[in-house]
Amino acid sequence: MTKHIFALALAAAAATANAQDAPFGTEADAAYAADLWSVMEELRMVGAGMIHAIPYEGIEPHGLMLETFFTEGTVDGHTGTLIVKRNYGPAGVSADEVQAAPEEHLGSITVMFRREQGYDADNQDWFWVKYLPDGTLDQNPAGMQLAGRVAKGADAGCIACHSGSDNYLFTNAAITP
């Protein structure tokens, strides 16, 4: 019995340490992502009445048809670059189909927001989020919410892929590191 209690206590301590060390998906990340969603609603980047652009062809892991917006947003008193990418599908969907019924084809919304200096200096202070169309956070297969320093230090994922560009963007050279 004592061995089982010790094992459970050890497992709980390890889980707590891992949760505290997680580079993304924390309660603080989720709260910040919720604040960011509210800002994007005010800017009409998401939600009812969101503005639209002409969709263009994309590639995985984003949608096969995309809309991308570059603007600024202010979260908790900090104003930073805000990039909102709407990811549409399924494979074979056309720009005309997306324009006719965007809500039927929207799979997710991926966002990069440049936070305050020092947030993540290794990765130009970008905050990464993947939302479902209703504003809830998407999760990876392990159940971690995709908000914060998503996949920091991993061989694949948001940061690993985007670090292949000097400014972490593949669509706009006007935003400097």
Enumerate the predicted regions with their spans:
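N-terminal secretory signal peptides
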Residues: 20-92
